[in-house]
Amino acid sequence: MGSDRKIRVVVGGVFDIIHAGHVHFLKMAKELGDELIVIVAHDETVKKRKGRPPINPAEDRAEVLKAIRYVDDVVIGKPGEISLDLIKRLKPDVIALGPDQDFDCEDLKRKLKSIGLNVEVIRLPYLYKKDRAKTSKIIERITEIFCD
């Protein structure tokens, strides 16, 4: 008899202007398990990490993510750095990192192990045209087209 236990995958990110790169990332993350939960970065976290506020507030970013078929649930992260408490509550089997997220996989595994979680941490590769599938590049193109 097989187990009915679902494999839970968790990803996190800003997801400010959803683009094809995000969709490819979410699809690949979903393929790692049965259930995909997205932690969308809190507005304060975006300001701190990117040096600017997000274009869209966290509630709007979460709503857009919920509409993507690969996503089973979305939670808004707490202000500040990655919340180990939130991850502990979500009980992931796998955490999938994006190719441009600046977390060290082994360091994250150690931190998770220190709070009693044995989680597989995987860095996913770029699956789409990285010169186009980056929010910063989209903002640059919008600025070039509409602000000249």
From Swiss-Prot:
Its EC number is 2.7.7.2. It is an enzyme of class 2 (transferase). ATP binds at V14, F15, H19, A20, G21, H22, D100. Keywords: ATP-binding, FAD, Flavoprotein, FMN, Nucleotide-binding, Nucleotidyltransferase, Transferase. One of its GO terms (molecular function) is ATP binding. It catalyses: FMN + ATP + H(+) = FAD + diphosphate. This is FAD synthase. It comes from Pyrococcus horikoshii (strain ATCC 700860 / DSM 12428 / JCM 9974 / NBRC 100139 / OT-3).
